[in-house]
Amino acid sequence: MLRRLRLPVILATAALLAGLLASPLKAAIWPEQWWSFKRTSLEKLTPGDQGVWQEYGLKEAERATYEDGALKFTATGWRVNDTTAALAVFQWQRPQGWKKSSLSELALENGPNAYFTFGNYVIRLEGYIPDEEKRQILFVQLPRLERGPLPTLPGHLPAAGLDANSERYILGPASLEHFEPRLPPSAAAFHMGAEAQIAQYESPKGPVTLALFSYPTPAMAKKQVLEFGKLSGVLVKRTGPMIAVVVGGQDADFSERLLAQVNYRAQVSWDEQTKPVEPNMGDVILTAFKFAGLLMVVTLLVGAMMAGVRFFGRRYLGWEKEGEALLTLHLDDRR
């Protein structure tokens, strides 16, 4: 009996495995249908530099091909932790020579190609750029979308002398070691909530790296600036909760001028107290009359409904008319 059952079980298991292998790959980012375009291929991506990607919180990476008649384009997407990580990936993976675009707050274009961020997604389109309406159709389908403000640290980089596409956003020891190994993670103290923005500058005597480290409070920055000051070959400055570090500067004057351009600008917002609106007595009286009138209408409607029910019951259902109950106090009996 067991021998008879063995062959069917083996065949069923083989069929199940074959079905699983033959089943189409399930997409984690790109939908099957995008407007009039149909997805014709899907590829899961496994990027290198796993330590950096893990620090940026990479969740999914996919490349898909879409077609609509003769029109065909390729879409690559990365989903990471949040908008800060999306900024870091955008700076790291951006193509060289592309121009700024208005597709989003962080966007580049090059002919029919686009590269931009949307929330915690980084998207690259090659061969066709859908219009705003079609892009919105994609955005509402993106799973686990998270929106938030971009970090303000990149805005503190001096513009003069900045090498294009040299910016790299640092979220921890792995990305710091990958992009600027001359600065030790122990000096940065990422466990205190630090983030950093680094960039390259051209001086008359060679390239210079500027690293801006941001901390939750000025007190933390004041403590860590002492650690950076212990390093050799660097020039350090603290401004507010931010530390500026120049690395590899062979031109001392250029390094000093570069540091002088870095100044923390606090962004403070508050709600102004507004004078309470005094009620208009005419409106108050009018509202009271409206409410009283509404109560009268409701009372009349309820009374008419009850009278209608009693009339219908007596006329068609044979309800007997009950005598009116009379309450007697019998006060004369107590005399």
Predicted regions mapped to residue ranges:
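N-terminal secretory signal peptides that target proteins for export/translocation
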Residues: 1-6
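Soluble, non-membrane globular domain cores that form compact, hydrophobic packing
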Residues: 19-209, 213-335
